[in-house]
Structure formats: structure tokens, C-alpha cells
Amino acid sequence: MSGVAEPDCYLTYDITSDTLTLYVPDFDLRRAIWMGPTLGLAEARERYNIDQAKYRSTLEQDILDWASRRAIGSVIYVIHDNQKPVVPFPYLKFNHEDLIPAMDTCREIKDGHEIGLIRRANEISTSAHTEILRNISGMRNEAEIQGKFLDSCVSLGAKNQSYEIIAASGENAAVLHYTRNDEPLKGRQLVCLDAGAEWNCYASDVTRTFPMQPRWPSAEAFSVYSVVQRMQEECIKRISEGVRYLDLHILAHKIAIEELLRLGIFRGGSIAEILKSGASLVFFPHGLGHHVGLEVHDVSGRSLMALEEQEYQGLPLRGCRAPCTLSAPHLRAGMVVTVEPGIYFSRLALDDAKQKPLSKYIDMQLVAEYIPVGGVRIEDDVLVTRDGWENLTSAPKGRAMLDIIGEGARLRA
């Protein structure tokens, strides 16, 4: 709500007077000697868009003064029940149920300042992803990728990551949230790097999948990358205010099925039949995307991918709704959403699929040749505008990505 990252601060907003007050810790000499001074009143007023700053010790009295000027039964809204201040005022009511839903609804639309922070987070992430591409040909372990990414972000002033870095090589890329990042790169075809910097509390969420050398290591790797690239491009270009995000999610599955039919991985059915069977979930098990903001999976009022249960009757891919957290039935200008299709070759998922009727649509013998690819995911953060979209992520992909890998390899030759 305020962008204040300092500990032990409190924030109140008086709706009637439209007054935003930040309460900062009282000065503590011992704490200041050991840890440095805490945020002061003058600094708080200068740094943050607030109406007034006060010390924490005045909070309870301010609440009592506020309550004394209000009618009996006036309500103070708090985020959590354990945040209620202890005040001796029997007629004061606290509500911890209604504030979070209201805040969630407000957070789905970003203003210009918020978009600027997300844009800067993406710029830093792009720089870090590019540094990895320049150095990947000389790296030996997933841990080096993680360390280099962190180093690049911190050097640009972003000390915090939006989420735990995923640096998954080979078959590890088939694990959606792989974070061990401790295996050697030798003999692996691709690396899936899902990593994004945080800037002033706002997140970025960026994924690139790439080889260790400036060429595709196999026909299978190139084919899968091309499929995912098309899935992403087709979905992004359809983003606009009023578009239903769930339709883009289903479109991504249809494109995946079409392309996997072309490769021979799917067989014996039409796009509609395979979609209805759920077979595409074996290879694309997560949602197309989510909001980005103060959290990497940002909150919102209502999720497009988590409709009311009755609204799912007759919809394909019912099992996909949980991973997506987009709210509101249709996209609106000011939303920032990820578009992150992926195709994965998980041994566990394939073994499970063999036991199901949908296995008749999958050429298990052929798909075994793709297991060393692991998985491919490409993810950008996209701003919804009134007449379309703006991609806030500019990390290289495709041919430009390979060119940078090649430049780095030549410098080390």
C-alpha cells in the first residue's frame, strides 16, 4: 500500500478525510548503535507518498481520538485479526474480513507509478538474463547460473529476487518449480532459467530456455522450442482489454496440440478430441499466466482461471484452473500479466498417462526421444492496454538469444 519496506511500521488510512498516515518506530539508541537508525519522520515524509508521519507510540491514542469523534459502532478495518491494536474503547469495532478482498480488487489494476516499477524490475531481469547467455558456454553447474544471475541483479541495485531462482538443466526442466540448482550442465541439452528481480517491492517474472552453445543441440530441442515460441506469440498478440484470459489459455493448448500432432507426438485424434481428453495436460500442466505486482503471483478480486464451479460445466481443461490467478472475467487496461506457455517431458507425467485412456493419443515410443529435452518455457510480463498490449520484458529469445550465446563463446575462445 505504501512501498515502505522498513520493519515495525504501521499504516492507517482515514477514508472520510482521505488521510494516509505512516507510523514509524520510535528512536531506540541501542538499536541505532547496533543496526543503524530506523526510519525517521522527516525521511518518511520525503521518501513516501503519505499525508503525515508519526511515531508508533502515538498509534493507540490516535485511534482513541478517532473513535471518540465517531458514532458508536464505527468500524476500523484491519488486514489480520492479530493486528488489532489494544485500545480501551468498548464500542469500537474491528473488521478483519472485508479489507483484504477490497485491496485485492484494487491491486489488479496498476497505475503509472506501479507500471514504472515493474518495468524497472524487468529491465534489471533482462540485463541478468543477458549476462547468463553471454557466459553460459563457459558454465559448468546450475549453481553458477544462479550465482551469476544474483550477482547481476545486486550490482544493479536489486538485492531481492521476486521468487526463488529456477535454473533447471536437462530433465530437471520438466520439474516446474525446480530450485535445487546444484547439478552439472555437462551432457544436458537445454537450461530453463526462470528468474526475476524485485524493484522497490514490485516483481518481475521472466523465463528463458536456451542451449549451452549457439546452436540447437538436437532436432527435438529446436522443435519443442519452436512450438512454445508460437504458443506465446499467438497468445500475446491477442491480448487486449475485453479479452477473456481463459480463452488465451485454451488457445495455447490448441496450438500445442496442433504442433504435437505435426511432430507425431499426438496421434489418432482431432484437436478437439485430444483437447477434451486432457492429453495436452500431460505436456502443458500449468496455467498460461497470472498477475504480476507486489507479489510475483499477485492477488486480485476474481480469478479468470478459477471461475465458479458451475461455470466450468462443458469447459475443456477443467483441471487447469488452479495455477492461474488472474482475476476478473476479462482483461482490463492496467493489468500486468504473464504469458508463460511451456511444453514438458516429465517421466512421472508420462508414466501416469500410460495408465489412462488418453494414452491412445500419445506415441509413447516417439515421445521417449524428447525426454532429454526436459522442458521449454518462455515467459514475459505483458501490460494490457486499451487497444492491445505492451511487452515489458525484453530479455533475448529465439535467434537473438543464440547470437548472444555465440558472442560470449567467441570471447572465451
From Swiss-Prot:
Gene Ontology terms describing biological process: proteolysis
Residues noted as binding Mn(2+) 2 in the record, renumbered to the chain: 194, 205, 379
Pfam family, one: Peptidase_M24
SUPFAM superfamilies according to UniProt: Creatinase/aminopeptidase, Creatinase/prolidase N-terminal domain
Names of required cofactors: Mn(2+)
Alphabetized Gene3D superfamilies for the sequence: Creatinase/methionine aminopeptidase superfamily (3.90.230.10), Creatinase/prolidase N-terminal domain (3.40.350.10)
Cofactor: how bound: Binds 2 manganese ions per subunit.
E.C. designation(s): 3.4.11.9
Enzyme class: hydrolase
Protein purpose: Catalyzes the removal of a penultimate prolyl residue from the N-termini of peptides.
Protein name according to UniProt: Probable Xaa-Pro aminopeptidase UREG_07123
